[in-house]
């Protein structure tokens, strides 16, 4: 996949003009009180519910087009909105309103010997671009999190959800206007032409950061072609390592949960590593448990399968010779998302957690727990698999930067 496609100058102008409007809106958003933002979020939730019939009508147009194109049922389900899901996205906005506001939080500060008073505090990023695939709920999630963190957002969703996203954004913008706020805090970019992505991710000086949400192809293309900072999210080749000191009952329960709970999400297990010391018993037992649950086990995996994010009822199985071999395997094939060890050996667990390079490392727990809500952060914009600027579940604090404030009393620096 490539997002680096030529486009007519008018599309470039359209995207850049939207970014300029977002920049203006972001300057006001950065100074809003917490109560004003919370009131706007609650108003947006009310408006989404009031406009549910319009949103569902738009969604039905998208679904009709998708069905005609032979879209698989799993993808249709991700695209679909119904009254219950509309209730869910509205509840999500109210939840964000209840979360602590990160803007203005003082992270550290002190008074220097010369009397200067320093403090470092959180400030919004500014203009955030979100590029995402066919889940219209992301439209509302992204709006809620960016508004609460004082950012303006440019949304570039999938053409498969064009009518759904347009209806949702119309409701969100109407709620902002009703609250006396700038509707350009949230804007939907054209999705009919892939080049709109190119113009968004190359709008250096207009857009502060772009966050791609979707499959590996989308994320790789955005990161490759972007000229503005990006935060990679989501690609998950997650492993469960069953150590020689593992309780196999526990290992089986954790493995089945990690693989089968929701196989199409980024925190699902895609590989299981079994210690050679227990392989004779553990391999047939865990293979049978997986197969009984409907999982296809790739027991002699190819290089491609070892690196695969299946997002399906498939899993690669490999035998490793001890904890260091497991660590080496994970660091070679993992995507830096979530890795898990099942063991009763504290030293082995500590070695694994210290040496595995991932955003989250689980000990005797399912990879499925890597989630902003499960971590107690509330909503999230995605799971960052990079190290700068954020790593792991991205909640409100991860949508901020910092500013140093220095107070003096006529201070000047000596020559």
UniProtKB/Swiss-Prot annotation:
Transmembrane segments: none annotated. It is an enzyme of class 1 (oxidoreductase). It is found in: Cytoplasm. Pathway: Amino-acid biosynthesis; L-proline biosynthesis; L-glutamate 5-semialdehyde from L-glutamate: step 2/2. One of its GO terms (molecular function) is NADP binding. Keywords: Amino-acid biosynthesis, Cytoplasm, NADP, Oxidoreductase, Proline biosynthesis. It comes from the Bacteria. GO terms for biological process: L-proline biosynthetic process. It holds the Pfam family Aldedh. One of its GO terms (cellular component) is cytoplasm. The keyword Lipid metabolism does not apply. The keyword NADP applies. Its main location: cytoplasm. Its EC number is 1.2.1.41. SUPFAM superfamilies: ALDH-like. It catalyses: L-glutamate 5-semialdehyde + phosphate + NADP(+) = L-glutamyl 5-phosphate + NADPH + H(+). Belongs to the gamma-glutamyl phosphate reductase family. Catalyzes the NADPH-dependent reduction of L-glutamate 5-phosphate into L-glutamate 5-semialdehyde and phosphate. The product spontaneously undergoes cyclization to form 1-pyrroline-5-carboxylate. This is Gamma-glutamyl phosphate reductase. It comes from Mycobacterium sp. (strain KMS).
